[in-house]
């Protein structure tokens, strides 16, 4: 655990991966369309093309209009360079969600949100960009707030030419901080140390299992990604087990991300991880049930987001077992919860 933050730039990612065709793609009632609006704004239009009302999780997803989470992915240089994301990635406590954490869409209904991409991405150099939205959106049945599954979504490719000077004038969703002292003291410090120790143990065990191909098809859809899965998990184990880590750990809320049901969040551009109050009050040190949430796998989840640990950092393509296992192989390989769920499964022999 490190006291001063380290700034890092998100590493290159493949445009081909973002735009690849998923041969296992499932039918979905969701239609997502992106359209340019002004210099750097993107209008996102979500339509329910199904025959029944949908109760979709908005908290922490691309539908979230409060938290500065990644709503679209942007690529430059003809699609070869992923644009650095400057917001936060969160892990939610998936039990005890509230009705206002969801968006209800009747059959045929449309919801529109506007995303100011310059507030969340590094666009000051300007140029040509390709924009996507793709993942699995968790839902609850009827008026329930208990997650029941996930629905795939994939937008069109939106090509934009952005004026860098104009984009640079847009206020950032998160203000940069040069140094933030750790507030993990007393019992919180003890809890975080235990979580990181367990994180290192679980990540090491999961890395060994991945090398052997154990359970990979369930959580990552293929065994061909074994070396990448294992390498990321080994990097996480190293960081969780180090006293001179590549991430900064904090127990207060300097970026105001600890809203209801947020267990922890990471600011990837700073390799900065914050553990929220419910991380300490609502989670066990280690889960005793398959796919259960705990402090160890929450730490592991957040560590995978940090590009300073393993580059590029992961996305939040799908929360929870249902959403994570609905992802394509490429999406799962870059999904934080897939690693957390996999580590849990190896630990408990699920």
UniProtKB/Swiss-Prot annotation:
One of its GO terms (molecular function) is metalloendopeptidase activity. One of its GO terms (cellular component) is extracellular region. Disulfide bonds join 184-251, 258-276. Secreted metalloproteinase that allows assimilation of proteinaceous substrates. Shows high activities on basic nuclear substrates such as histone and protamine. CDD domains: M35_deuterolysin_like (cd11008). The lineage of its organism: Eukaryota, Fungi, Dikarya, Ascomycota, Pezizomycotina. Keywords: Cleavage on pair of basic residues, Disulfide bond, Hydrolase, Metal-binding, Metalloprotease, Protease, Secreted, Signal, Zinc, Zymogen. It comes from Phaeosphaeria nodorum (strain SN15 / ATCC MYA-4574 / FGSC 10173) (Glume blotch fungus). The keyword Nucleus does not apply. It catalyses: Preferential cleavage of bonds with hydrophobic residues in P1'. Also 3-Asn-|-Gln-4 and 8-Gly-|-Ser-9 bonds in insulin B chain. Belongs to the peptidase M35 family. Its cofactor is Zn(2+). Its main location: secreted. Zn(2+) binds at residues 301, 305, 316. The active site is at 302. It is an enzyme of class 3 (hydrolase). This is Neutral protease 2 homolog SNOG_10522. Binds 1 zinc ion per subunit. Residues 19-180 form a propeptide.
């Amino acid at each position: 655990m490190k006291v001063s933050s380290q700034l890092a730039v998100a590493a290159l990612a493949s445009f081909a991966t973002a735009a690849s065709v998923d041969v296992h793609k499932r039918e979905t009632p969701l239609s997502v369309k992106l359209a340019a609006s002004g210099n750097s704004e993107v209008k996102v239009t979500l339509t329910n093309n199904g025959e029944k009302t949908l109760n979709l999780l908005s908290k922490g997803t691309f539908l979230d209009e409060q938290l500065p989470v990644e709503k679209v992915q942007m690529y430059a240089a003809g699609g070869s360079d992923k644009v650095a994301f400057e917001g936060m990635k969160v892990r939610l406590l998936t039990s005890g969600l509230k009705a206002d954490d969801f968006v209800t869409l009747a059959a045929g209904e449309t919801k529109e949100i506007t995303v100011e991409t310059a507030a969340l991405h590094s666009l000051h150099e300007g140029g040509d960009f390709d924009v996507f939205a793709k993942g699995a959106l968790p839902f609850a049945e009827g008026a329930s707030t208990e997650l029941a599954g996930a629905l795939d979504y994939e937008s069109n490719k939106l090509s934009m030419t952005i004026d860098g000077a104009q984009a640079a004038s847009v206020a950032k969703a998160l203000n940069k901080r040069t140094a933030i002292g750790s507030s993990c003291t007393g019992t919180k410090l003890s809890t975080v140390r235990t979580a990181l120790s367990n994180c290192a143990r679980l990540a090491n065990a999961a890395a060994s299992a991945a090398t052997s191909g154990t359970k990979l098809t369930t959580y990552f859809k293929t065994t061909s990604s074994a070396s990448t899965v294992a390498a990321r998990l080994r990097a996480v184990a190293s960081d969780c087990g180090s006293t001179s880590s590549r991430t900064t750990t904090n127990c207060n809320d300097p970026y105001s991300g600890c809203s209801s049901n947020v267990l922890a969040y990471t600011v990837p551009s700073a390799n900065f991880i914050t553990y929220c109050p419910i991380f300490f009050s609502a989670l066990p040190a280690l889960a005793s049930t398959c796919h259960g949430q705990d402090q160890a796998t929450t730490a592991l989840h957040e560590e995978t987001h940090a590009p300073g640990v393993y580059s590029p950092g992961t996305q939040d393509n799908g929360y929870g077992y249902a959403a994570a296992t609905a992802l394509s192989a490429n999406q799962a390989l870059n999904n934080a919860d897939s690693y957390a769920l996999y580590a849990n499964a190896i630990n408990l022999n699920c």
